Amino acid sequence: MSETATLPLRFTDSAASKVKNLIADEENPNLKLRVYITGGGCSGFQYGFTFDDKVNEDDFTIEKQGVALVVDPMSLQYLVGGSVDYSEGLEGSRFIVTNPNAKTTCGCGSSFSI
């Protein structure tokens, strides 16, 4: 069965690879990339990324390439069916959330509404 059929959120190879490199730079193998949603931004909700060395009991975790992506249950409900990717291009390098639940998205891609 494919990853997208079994998991509510996809963690791409390019995102996992970048997380692996960033964790190596920090020299703390216990770090995980936490993705979360908060109120704010020009569209009502915004995505956030942080490194965290804790996983809460009710967090959702995806492991790939020896690193973990962690999402709290409140944020996960807004991200089901989406993906976390990493891109390097003319506009810079960044983690990107593709969210099929977002009705509108801000031009910068970091804010959305449902």
From Swiss-Prot:
GO terms for cellular component: cytosol. HAMAP family: Fe_S_insert_ErpA. PROSITE patterns: HESB (PS01152). Pfam families: Fe-S_biosyn. It comes from Sodalis glossinidius (strain morsitans). Belongs to the HesB/IscA family. One of its GO terms (biological process) is iron-sulfur cluster assembly. GO terms for molecular function: 2 iron, 2 sulfur cluster binding; 4 iron, 4 sulfur cluster binding; iron ion binding. NCBIfam families: iron-sulfur cluster assembly accessory protein (TIGR00049), PRK13623.1 (NF010147). Its cofactor is iron-sulfur cluster. Keywords: Iron, Iron-sulfur, Metal-binding. Homodimer. This is Iron-sulfur cluster insertion protein ErpA. The keyword Iron applies. Iron-sulfur cluster binds at residues 42, 106, 108. Required for insertion of 4Fe-4S clusters for at least IspG. Binds 1 iron-sulfur cluster per subunit.
